[in-house]
Each structure stands twice: as C-alpha cells, then as structure tokens.
Amino acid sequence: MSAFTPASEVLLRHSDDFEQSRILFAGDLQDDLPARFECAASRAYTQQFHHWQALSRQMGDNVRFSLVAQASDVADCDTLIYYWPKNKPEAQFQLMNILSLMPVGSDVFVVGENRSGVRSAEPMLADYAPLNKVDSARRCGLYHGRLEKQPQFSLESWWAEYNIDGLTIKTLPGVFSRDGLDVGSQLLLSTLTPHTKGKVLDVGCGAGVLSAALASHSPKVRLTLCDVSAPAVEASRATLAANGLEGEVFASNVFSEVKGRFDMIISNPPFHDGMQTSLDAAQTLIRGAVRHLNSGGELRIVANAFLPYPKILDETFGFHEVIAQTGRFKVYRTVMTRQAKK
C-alpha cells in the first residue's frame, strides 16, 4: 500500500471537512489513507486479511480483521467512510452490520469507482441514511448522509447454501462463487482423482468447495485451507462441518500464515483485488509453493487461459503441463523436483 486509489484521492479533496471527525474506515481498503488521514481519530475495520496486514503496521490495534464488526470497532466514532467494493451483497452485509452499531446522527460517507456500482449505495441506504452525491471526480462518486435509523443485523440471516454432488456448500456475501460452483473450479475438480492421500493445502479456499469434494472421495487426505477473506474462512469451516469433514482453516495472505510442507497444493487463484487487476497473489502462490511442497509434491491450479502463468511456472519449477482445458480455462500441474528454485 503506497499510492492512493482514485477513491481516496476524491476523499482528499475534502480533507479539511474531516479534521474534527472520529472516523471508522471500512469496505474495500486498497491503500493506507486510513493511517495517514488527518482527523481527530481514525479506526479501520476490514474483512480482508491482507488489508489488515498492511494497515496494522501503521495503525496497530486501531485496525481489526474479522467477519463482523463489533461495538468496540465503532467506539467513539462519529463518522463512517465506506469504500464501496465491486460485490453488492458484500457491501450490503458490511453496511448493515456497521450501521447497526453506529450511533444515530453519525455522518456516513460512501466512496467508490463508478464502474463498481457505487450508485447502488443510494437505494440501499435510503431507509437508514439517505445519501446525496457530494462529489464526482476520477471516475468515482462520493456520497454523504446522516444515520437516521439503525438497521437490524443478524449474521444467521446472511448464510446461504447450495448442493453439489451430495455435498452441502455453506456461503456468505463476498465469498467467491457464492451462488454456485464456478466453471474454473469445476474444471479443476474434474482432475482430482479419488483416494488421494497425504497433506493437501487449498489456497484461496472460498467456500471450501474444492477441499470438500476432494475429501468426500479421499477420506485419508489431511486438509488445510486458507483465504484472505474472513467470510471465506468462516464459510469453509461451515462447509466442512456440514459434511462431517475435518480440516484446519485459517486466514492467510497466500502463504503468510502457512507452516510446513504439503503433498499437494490446489488453488483457483484470484486475479482481481477489489476493482484492480492483480496477478500478485498468483505469482506469490507459484513462487512460494516451492517452500511448502514436499519432494515430489504437486501444485495444481486453474486459471483463465490468457493469464501468463506458464512462464512463471517454468521459471519456478522448470516445467509445467496442462492436464485439462476449455476455451476459457486451463488446469496447470507441476511437481516439486530438484530443479525447482527454492
């Protein structure tokens, strides 16, 4: 986090208005403005582990990562600055949660890129904090309102589920493939053979679909799942529990919290971080896998066919093979050998 996003640059045009404000920053926190903004007090709340990592270096205990905000996160705050994400259900979940805790009369600012659908904030908050557009620049909109009524928020009401091949998949807003199995994961699943053994790490686990499907056919497999998203971590735990499966699930920025080595690493890595295209996570995954695979261990990932992963795989492992493909997706496989760059 260094350069400011367009949304933050729009906020900075109004920085004088916030000098006396006690602000909670939330939503898609793509930069370190919450740590550098001149105001009376600044807190941040995020569902994204990598955003918490970056901000906690400067903000310490004034930034918190969790599935839901708590009363302590909004303590003494009189202003919410919410960065609109590209996922509307995620925005609704977070805003209903946070506004259920903010005191009536609080200032509510929503900022985001026009292409993210930030205009949806107006109808979404109409019953709680009617918004007016106060600025438009850098292809972003900035909206302001005052909290007139706290919404009701119950985490239980936000859970959803679907079924795949007899498995119950539990999910929450903001989790990848919330409404059903995506085509890429489906292709990767088709390559996993029954009776797989050993330790398997599922990076970017989402709702836990890949791990649950693998374990249902391979009861001797030992699962570890991780994701940057708090909703994904909770959804994966719930998916495993719903199907009577066991596994360790935790938040991690790719390998940041991962210990030890594995016999297989599987992933459908993201190539977007919020609204921005980013191959960072996938590059970190491929290059870091050599430090977390046993000798003879395998990395198996699915990706959009146009992404430049073959080059990174070859640079890191010395070779790769395509074991399944469609017009849009490819499943890549490579193995930990002596020629891999550790």
UniProtKB/Swiss-Prot annotation:
InterPro entries with a match to the protein in the record: DNA_methylase_N6_adenine_CS, Mtase_sm_N, rRNA_ssu_MeTfrase_C, RsmC/RlmG, SAM-dependent_MTases_sf, Small_mtfrase_dom
Keywords: Cytoplasm, Methyltransferase, rRNA processing, S-adenosyl-L-methionine, Transferase
Catalytic function, reaction form: guanosine(1207) in 16S rRNA + S-adenosyl-L-methionine = N(2)-methylguanosine(1207) in 16S rRNA + S-adenosyl-L-homocysteine + H(+)
Transmembrane segments: none
GO molecular function: 16S rRNA (guanine(1207)-N(2))-methyltransferase activity; nucleic acid binding
Superkingdom of origin: Bacteria
Coiled coil location: none
Enzyme class: transferase
EC number: 2.1.1.172
Keyword Coiled coil found: no
GO cellular component terms given for this protein: cytoplasm
PANTHER family named in the record: RIBOSOMAL RNA SMALL SUBUNIT METHYLTRANSFERASE C
Known role: Specifically methylates the guanine in position 1207 of 16S rRNA in the 30S particle.
Record family assignment: Belongs to the methyltransferase superfamily. RsmC family.
Subunit structure: Monomer.
Name under which the protein is recorded: Ribosomal RNA small subunit methyltransferase C
Upper classification of the organism: Bacteria, Pseudomonadati, Pseudomonadota, Gammaproteobacteria, Enterobacterales
